[in-house]
C-alpha cells in the first residue's frame, strides 16, 4: 500500500482539502502585496531642484522656476539640473538674486541639484525615493532595492527548501510568518537607506518560505485527479492580492504605513497555523507514524469517510513508511543526467527566466501611461483573471507548447509595437501595456502547468524548484533593466521584448504534453522522446 492508497481511504478531495486551500490563501495573497509593493513604495513623483528663497506668491512661482530651471525637450522643467546663475525673466522682478551677472557668454550653464529636491506630494505623501532622494544620479539605488529583495527571495527559497524537508512544512510555515512579520516591521521602521535595503532583502528571504512551503502543503493532501484544478484555483488568490494592493495603496499614501499594512496580515497567519495540517506524507518519511495517523483520521472525519483506527493499522502505515523511504531523493544533478532531461531542463530554465523578466519588467514600471498608478495597478489586477480563463481554454485546444510560445510571443509583440507608438499617445501606450500584461500573466500561468507535466513524478518538485530559481533570477534583473533608459529611452522595452521573444522560440523546442500520460520515471521521459523521434 502506498500513500496514494491511504489518501484514497481518507478522501483525496473534500472539506479537509478545501479548508487547507482557504488557509493557504493568505500567504498566496501576501506574496504579490510584497512582490509588487515597489510600484507604490518606490514610486518617483514629479520633482525638481530645491530652490531656497522661492516666493510665497503662487502667481510668481512659475516665473521663479523659469528663472532657475532649464527645460527638457518636451517642455517640462528639468528634474535633475538647475541654472548655475539665475536667468533674468523679462518684465518681472523676482528679487535681488535673479541676475545673470557673472555668467559667461553663450549657453546658460547648468549644474546638478546641490540642495536636494522638491517633490509633488499630490499622489504620494512619501516614498523611499522622496525620503532618501533616490532620484537623478541616485535613481539606480531605488531600483537596487527591488533587485536585492528578489535576490533575497532566491536565496530564501533554497534555504526553506532544505529546511522544510528536514523540519517539516508546518513548522517552517510558522517561521516564515514570524520572520516576515518581524522583518517587515523593521523595514517600515528603517532609519536610513542601508537599513531598509538589508531588512527588505531579509524580508524577501522570509517571504520565500511561502513560495516553497504552500504548494507542497496543498498538493500532498490532494489526490492526483484534483491537483491541477486546485492549482488553478490557488493562482486566483495571487490575482486577489494584486487587486488588494491597488486598494490599500490608494488608501495609504505613506510608504511606511503601506509597508506596515502589507505586513500585519502575518498576525492572523500565525494564528491560522493552529488549523494547518502537517503533511502526512512527510511525517511518514520521517517515521512519525502516530502523528501522521492523527492527521489522516482528522482528514477522514472532516471528509465524512467512515474510517476507523483499525483501517489505518500500524502495519499498513509502516509499509508506507518503508515505501516512501525506499524512494531515492532526487537532486538538481538528476535533471541533467540524460539527454532528454537536459533538453527539457535547459529549455524550461530559459522559458521561466523570460516569463519572469518580462512579467516583472512590465508590472513594476507603470510610468508613461495615461492613468495614475492606482488605476494602473487595479487594471493590472483585473486583467489577470480573464488571462487565466483564456489559458484554461487555449491549453485544451492548442496544447501547452503552442499556448506558452504564443503568450510569450504576444508579450514580445506588444513590447515591439510600443516602440513604434509615440510616447505622447497615452491611450495607445496604456492599451498596449494592458494587453502585454494579459499575455505575460497567461505565460506565467501556462509555465506552471506545462513544466509540471514535462518532468517525471520522481523529479517534478525538483524540476519546478530549479526553474523557479531561474525565474527569480529574471525577476531580480528586471528592475535593473529599467536603468537602460539612460543609454536609450526605449532600450528597456527592447530588452523585455527581446528576452520574451527568445523564450517564446525556446518554448517551441519543448515536447507537447496535451492529453499525454504524465511520466512517472526518467525512463518514461526517454521512452516518450524515442517514440516521437520514430514518428
UniProtKB/Swiss-Prot annotation:
Induction: Strongly inhibited by androgen, and weakly stimulated by estrogen and progesterone, which results in gender differences (female > male) that appears in puberty, for expression in kidney. It holds the Pfam family Sugar_tr. It comes from the Eukaryota. InterPro entries: MFS_dom, MFS_sugar_transport-like, MFS_trans_sf, Orgcat_transp/SVOP. The chain crosses the membrane at residues 21-41, 144-164, 178-198, 202-222, 232-252, 257-277, 344-364, 375-395, 402-422, 429-449, 464-484, 489-509. One of its GO terms (biological process) is monoatomic ion transport. Its main location: membrane. Keywords: Cell membrane, Ion transport, Membrane, Transmembrane, Transmembrane helix, Transport. One of its GO terms (cellular component) is basal plasma membrane. Expressed in liver and kidney. Expressed at low levels in adipose tissue. Expressed in fetal liver. In kidney, expressed at the brush border of the proximal tubule S3 segment (S3) in the outer stripe and medullary rays. In kidney, expression is higher in female than male. It catalyses: orotate(out) + L-glutamate(in) = orotate(in) + L-glutamate(out); 3',5'-cyclic GMP(in) = 3',5'-cyclic GMP(out); GMP(in) = GMP(out); 2'-deoxyguanosine(in) = 2'-deoxyguanosine(out). It is a multi-pass membrane protein. GO terms for molecular function: alpha-ketoglutarate transmembrane transporter activity; organic anion transmembrane transporter activity; prostaglandin transmembrane transporter activity; sodium-independent organic anion transmembrane transporter activity; transmembrane transporter activity. It is found in: Basolateral cell membrane; Apical cell membrane; Cell membrane. Functions as a Na(+)-independent bidirectional multispecific transporter. Contributes to the renal and hepatic elimination of endogenous organic compounds from the systemic circulation into the urine and bile, respectively. Capable of transporting a wide range of purine and pyrimidine nucleobases, nucleosides, and nucleotides with cGMP, 2'deoxyguanosine and GMP being the preferred substrates. Involved in the uptake of clinically used drugs such as ketoprofen, indomethacin and methotrexate, and contributes to renal and hepatic drug elimination. Belongs to the major facilitator (TC 2.A.1) superfamily. Organic cation transporter (TC 2.A.1.19) family. NCBIfam families: 2A0119. This is Solute carrier family 22 member 7. It comes from Rattus norvegicus (Rat). The lineage of its organism: Eukaryota, Metazoa, Chordata, Craniata, Vertebrata. The gene is Slc22a7.
Amino acid at each position: 500500500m502506498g500513500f496514494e492508497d491511504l489518501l484514497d481511504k481518507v478522501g483525496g478531495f473534500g472539506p479537509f482539502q478545501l479548508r487547507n486551500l482557504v488557509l493557504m490563501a493568505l500567504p498566496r495573497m501576501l506574496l504579490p502585496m510584497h512582490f509588487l509593493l515597489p510600484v507604490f513604495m518606490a514610486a518617483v513623483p514629479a520633482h525638481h531642484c530645491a530652490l531656497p528663497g522661492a516666493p510665497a506668491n503662487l502667481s510668481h512661482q512659475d516665473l521663479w522656476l523659469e528663472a532657475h530651471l532649464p527645460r527638457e525637450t518636451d517642455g517640462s522643467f528639468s528634474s535633475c539640473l538647475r541654472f548655475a546663475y539665475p536667468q533674468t525673466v523679462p518684465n518681472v522682478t523676482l528679487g535681488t538674486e535673479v541676475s545673470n551677472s557673472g555668467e559667461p557668454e553663450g549657453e546658460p550653464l547648468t549644474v546638478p541639484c546641490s540642495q536636494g529636491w522638491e517633490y509633488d506630494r499630490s499622489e504620494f505623501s512619501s516614498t523611499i525615493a522622496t525620503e532618501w532622494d533616490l532620484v537623478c544620479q541616485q535613481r539606480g539605488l531605488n531600483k537596487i532595492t527591488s533587485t536585492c529583495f528578489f535576490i533575497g527571495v532566491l536565496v530564501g527559497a533554497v534555504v526553506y527548501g532544505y529546511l522544510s524537508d528536514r523540519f517539516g512544512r508546518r513548522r517552517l510555515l510558522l517561521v516564515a510568518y514570524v520572520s516576515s512579520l518581524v522583518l517587515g516591521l523593521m523595514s517600515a521602521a528603517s532609519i536610513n537607506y542601508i537599513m531598509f535595503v538589508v531588512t527588505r532583502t531579509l524580508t524577501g528571504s522570509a517571504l520565500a518560505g511561502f513560495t516553497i512551503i504552500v504548494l507542497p502543503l496543498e498538493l500532498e493532501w490532494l489526490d492526483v485527479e484534483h491537483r491541477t484544478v486546485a492549482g488553478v484555483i490557488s493562482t486566483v488568490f495571487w490575482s486577489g492580492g494584486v487587486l488588494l494592493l491597488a486598494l490599500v495603496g490608494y488608501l495609504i499614501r505613506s510608504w511606511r504605513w503601506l509597508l506596515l499594512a502589507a505586513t500585519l496580515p502575518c498576525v492572523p497567519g500565525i494564528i491560522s497555523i493552529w488549523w494547518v495540517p502537517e503533511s502526512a506524507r512527510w511525517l511518514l518519511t520521517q517515521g512519525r507514524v502516530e502523528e501522521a495517523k492523527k492527521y489522516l483520521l482528522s482528514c477522514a472525519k472532516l471528509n465524512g469517510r467512515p474510517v476507523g483506527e483499525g483501517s489505518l493499522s500500524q502495519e499498513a502505515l509502516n509499509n508506507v513508511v518503508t515505501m516512501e523511504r525506499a524512494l531515492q531523493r532526487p537532486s538538481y544533478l538528476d535533471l541533467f543526467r540524460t539527454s532528454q532531461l537536459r533538453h527539457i531542463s535547459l529549455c524550461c530554465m530559459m522559458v521561466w527566466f523570460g516569463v519572469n523578466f518580462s512579467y516583472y519588467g512590465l508590472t513594476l514600471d507603470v510610468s508613461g501611461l495615461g492613468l495614475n498608478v492606482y488605476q494602473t495597478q487595479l487594471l493590472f489586477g483585473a486583467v489577470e483573471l480573464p488571462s487565466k480563463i483564456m489559458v484554461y481554454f487555449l491549453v485544451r485546444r492548442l496544447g501547452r507548447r503552442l499556448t506558452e510560445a504564443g503568450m510569450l510571443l504576444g508579450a514580445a509583440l506588444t513590447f515591439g509595437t510600443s516602440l513604434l507608438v509615440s510616447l505622447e499617445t497615452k491611450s495607445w501606450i496604456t492599451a498596449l501595456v494592458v494587453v502585454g500584461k494579459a499575455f505575460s500573466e497567461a505565460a506565467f500561468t501556462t509555465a506552471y502547468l506545462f513544466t509540471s507535466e514535462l518532468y517525471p513524478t520522481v523529479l517534478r518538485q525538483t524540476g519546478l524548484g530549479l526553474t523557479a530559481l531561474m525565474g527569480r533570477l529574471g525577476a531580480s534583473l528586471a528592475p535593473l533593466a529599467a536603468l537602460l533608459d539612460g543609454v536609450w529611452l526605449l532600450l528597456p522595452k527592447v530588452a523585455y521584448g527581446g528576452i520574451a521573444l527568445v523564450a517564446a522560440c525556446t518554448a517551441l523546442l519543448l515536447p507537447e504534453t496535451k492529453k499525454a500520460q504524465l511520466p512517472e520515471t526518467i525512463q518514461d521521459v526517454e521512452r516518450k522522446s524515442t517514440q516521437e523521434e520514430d514518428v
